[in-house]
């Protein structure tokens, strides 16, 4: 039984809801929708609007409550169970998220969305053997759905087996030539085994499918760096920085690329300073700025930053090599300076 509200007031609230939705005042819309549901608690359209609003506003506890009400009116279906599972995951309850998907699987064991969601949760909870079993159902029953092959590749990559990921995806690359994730994973796997030609090929395809992918641009820039194609890597770094002034990784990688080429030390230093400003406790970024100071013969600053970097990541071999190089060169330069003074005397 709903609370009785004057019909004129209901009409006014409905108009207010439409205005709030049209003007993107979603928190206000949620408040108004809540009032309307109090008057008409079995109005499915209102409940679905409320669910969408609470999801957008990140009010996941409320979303879960609303999905439960929708479920009572419509009955249990796979989409609602998937939504409930996703909400449990957002609310950091992985056990209930998985339990909900087992219920969904019992109701429809061939549904590819249920299977994929189940596999994704199992991978996330490091239950790879179970994930493999359910994922095989996707491959067997839905061979034209790329997600089964992608899941196997993701598990291989998670296990640091890029060659296995390539073996999983490469036989199907033509069939999924316009699938961003397939091309991206192939490019990343080839990059990890230092096959830069194939890596560049697949990541370029991925970028053509989804030009806004920043991860793809980052990886392509690293490959162009590795192959000495610096015109292309510089273009990508400039694009990344110009489209997101908070991309610390782009600042750092561009700076490191320049200093490794012995180019534009002042500009590289400016880039590295931006990276440090954004992420002051990053061992990699502290090492980069220290290495730039070393190349600029400012050994004291170089030592300060690289030692700080090593304190954060004491097992990093590159940072250790940089520190040893700075100490060695500084000792040599200081020795030469002392020798010159003695010769003058």
Residue ranges: model-predicted function:
Residues 1-345:
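Alpha-solenoid helical repeat scaffolds
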């Amino acid at each position: 039984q709903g609370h009785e509200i004057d019909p004129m007031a209901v009409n006014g609230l409905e108009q207010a809801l439409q205005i709030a939705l049209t003007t993107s005042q979603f928190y206000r819309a949620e408040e108004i929708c809540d009032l309307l549901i109090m008057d008409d608690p079995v109005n499915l359209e209102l409940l679905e609007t409320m669910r969408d609003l609470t999801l957008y506003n990140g009010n996941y506890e409320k979303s879960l409550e609303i999905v439960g009400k929708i479920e009572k009116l419509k009955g249990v279906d796979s989409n609602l169970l998937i939504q409930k599972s996703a909400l449990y995951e957002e609310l950091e309850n992985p056990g209930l998220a998985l339990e909900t998907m087992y219920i969904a699987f019992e109701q429809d064991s061939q549904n590819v969305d249920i299977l994929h969601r189940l596999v994704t949760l199992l991978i996330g909870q490091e239950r790879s053997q179970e994930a493999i079993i359910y994922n095989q159902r996707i491959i067997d029953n839905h061979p034209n759905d790329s997600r089964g092959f992608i899941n196997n590749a993701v598990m291989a990559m998670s296990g640091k087996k890029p060659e296995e990921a390539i073996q999983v995806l490469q036989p199907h690359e033509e069939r999924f030539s316009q699938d961003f994730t397939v091309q991206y994973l192939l490019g990343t796997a080839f990059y990890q085994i230092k096959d830069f030609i194939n890596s560049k090929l697949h990541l370029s395809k991925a970028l053509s499918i989804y030009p806004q992918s920043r991860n793809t641009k980052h990886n392509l820039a690293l490959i162009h760096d590795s192959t000495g194609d610096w015109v292309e890597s510089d273009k990508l770094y400039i694009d990344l920085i110009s489209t997101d002034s908070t991309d610390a990784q782009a600042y750092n990688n561009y700076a490191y690329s320049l200093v490794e080429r012995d180019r534009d030390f002042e500009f590289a230093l400016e880039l590295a300073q931006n990276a440090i400003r954004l992420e002051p406790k990053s061992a990699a970024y502290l090492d980069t700025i220290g290495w730039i100071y070393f190349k600029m013969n400012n050994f004291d600053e170089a030592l300060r930053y690289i030692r700080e970097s090593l304190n954060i990541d004491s097992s990093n071999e590159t940072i250790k090599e940089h520190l040893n190089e700075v100490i060695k060169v500084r000792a040599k330069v200081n020795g030469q300076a002392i020798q010159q003074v003695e010769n003058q005397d």
